[in-house]
């Protein structure tokens, strides 16, 4: 356990030291910062804030994990698989951010390009790690269900789905970074109890990196992680749940990401249905993803506006409670 804490501390200190230099470089080169969607009026003042900060904590977490895993003879296939997805999905996010900021392409990678690259990463992960490790059984609330060839599309769905879910969650200061810290703390406990010390190392290292990033990402944020960070973190969580053979746990531990994604899907579907049925589109939520609904009118959407901190603490609490419930189901 000490090696993991040391690794996390190194990642924390490195990120805390490097982020200000990244911000200084960003501003010195007069790079255009974060663009704000015109519909999110309450966040327009944040336009121009440096973004792509995920580049820093990703590089730090990957290098520190490799260093400590090698030093403590924990450089396993599981570690390499997690770091592979972290790096590849980070590259996908980096390309998306790069096109938006440097090439002035508003949508970055189009949805088909992004999906194709995410699926490619999932295919490599499956055939190199999952299939090689004899995967094919899905853990459903503690019961192993043999899926055979169907486990392959499940893996792709899990990786792509949660990668995009965390991306949707990254919409207000500090929300995604601490939500993922809470999720990784839960997986650290699971990895420790299952004696998967290699995966424990990676989890704690990323926790250190994210806490270092949060120093500058908390409200008022001096930097955002960008798609380079959020897409990679979602892919990482999905990979960890698969590597631990505890896939089902991500539905509870990652309930915040599920809520955020579901709110968008419900909103779009209901709007299209009502427009076709009644001639005008209607909405379930004030705005999606769900954190914007909370900002504009609390849980009901009709109450007074919530501050970003209130939204953060509410959704962090949901993540923490669900993580504790998951651990209780597993070990009590």
Swiss-Prot record:
One of its GO terms (cellular component) is plasma membrane. Coiled coil: none annotated. Pfam families: Glycos_transf_4, MraY_sig1. Keywords: Cell cycle, Cell division, Cell membrane, Cell shape, Cell wall biogenesis/degradation, Magnesium, Membrane, Metal-binding, Peptidoglycan synthesis, Transferase, Transmembrane, Transmembrane helix. It is a multi-pass membrane protein. Its cofactor is Mg(2+). InterPro entries: Glycosyl_transferase_4, PNAcMuramoyl-5peptid_Trfase, PNAcMuramoyl-5peptid_Trfase_CS. It is found in: Cell membrane. PROSITE patterns: MRAY_2. GO terms for molecular function: metal ion binding; phospho-N-acetylmuramoyl-pentapeptide-transferase activity. Its EC number is 2.7.8.13. It catalyses: UDP-N-acetyl-alpha-D-muramoyl-L-alanyl-gamma-D-glutamyl-L-lysyl-D-alanyl-D-alanine + di-trans,octa-cis-undecaprenyl phosphate = Mur2Ac(oyl-L-Ala-gamma-D-Glu-L-Lys-D-Ala-D-Ala)-di-trans,octa-cis-undecaprenyl diphosphate + UMP. One of its GO terms (biological process) is regulation of cell shape. Pathway: Cell wall biogenesis; peptidoglycan biosynthesis. The chain crosses the membrane at residues 3-23, 52-72, 74-94, 115-135, 140-160, 172-192, 197-217, 223-243, 248-268, 311-331. Its main location: membrane. HAMAP family: MraY. Catalyzes the initial step of the lipid cycle reactions in the biosynthesis of the cell wall peptidoglycan: transfers peptidoglycan precursor phospho-MurNAc-pentapeptide from UDP-MurNAc-pentapeptide onto the lipid carrier undecaprenyl phosphate, yielding undecaprenyl-pyrophosphoryl-MurNAc-pentapeptide, known as lipid I. Belongs to the glycosyltransferase 4 family. MraY subfamily. PANTHER family: PHOSPHO-N-ACETYLMURAMOYL-PENTAPEPTIDE-TRANSFERASE (PTHR22926), PHOSPHO-N-ACETYLMURAMOYL-PENTAPEPTIDE-TRANSFERASE HOMOLOG (PTHR22926:SF5). This is Phospho-N-acetylmuramoyl-pentapeptide-transferase. The lineage of its organism: Bacteria, Bacillati, Bacillota, Bacilli, Lactobacillales. The gene is mraY.
